[in-house]
Regions:
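A glycine-anchored, Pro-Gly-centered beta-turn/N-cap motif
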Residues: 46, 109-111
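Short amphipathic, basic-aromatic surface patches that mediate peripheral association
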Residues: 53-64
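Short coil-to-beta strand junction motifs in C2/discoidin
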Residues: 64-72, 132
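Short, compositionally biased P/S/T/A/G/V-rich stretches that sit at domain boundaries
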Residues: 24-45
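N-terminal signal peptide c-region/cleavage motif recognized by signal peptidases
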Residues: 17-19
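Short acidic/polar inter-strand loop motif in beta-rich domains
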Residues: 81-83, 120-128
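Short beta-strand elements
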Residues: 129-141
Length: 141
């Protein structure tokens, strides 16, 4: 009976510590996330390759819990701030690149669009403080 309780307590503590670790891991102060291409104000005909840049941190797969590394998320036309205590949404405006991609082919309808990169940890949570790019605007013809 005591062994069962001890095992239950150990399992509960392990789960709680993993949840706390996975949400909002700290980041190096000099981490920089940016767009290699396109640049702010670019006018593009049709689909385009979006290339992501990251300095002073590493890129890894979603689910991999390596120190100072994460994976990219591309926010398209998102105006609401991210909640650092919630995982980054996954929908047509929040694209996940959990295989460690550093570029992606993007198709957007004609018009003006905003793009922003966010680095997520193993559980898709933003780091603390968040590692985000500047928001850029592109025009699709």
């Amino acid at each position: 009976m005591k062994i069962c309780r001890l095992i239950s307590v150990c399992v509960a503590l392990t789960c709680l510590s993993f949840a706390a670790y996975a949400q909002g891991k700290p980041t190096p102060k000099d981490a920089v996330l940016y767009f290699v291409w396109p640049q702010d104000g670019t006018t593009i005909k049709g689909g385009f390759w979006c290339r992501f840049g990251l300095r002073n941190m590493g890129v890894t797969h979603a689910g991999d819990n390596y120190q100072n590394s994460g994976h990219h998320h591309l926010l398209i036309d998102v105006n609401e701030p991210l909640d650092p205590n919630e995982p980054i949404a996954q929908d047509k405006s929040h694209l996940h690149f959990g295989a460690g991609q550093t570029e992606a082919r993007i198709e957007l309808p004609p018009g003006k669009h905003t793009l922003q990169l966010v680095l997520g940890d193993a559980g898709h949570y933003p780091f603390k403080p968040p590692v985000v790019s500047d928001k850029i605007t592109v025009r699709i013809k």
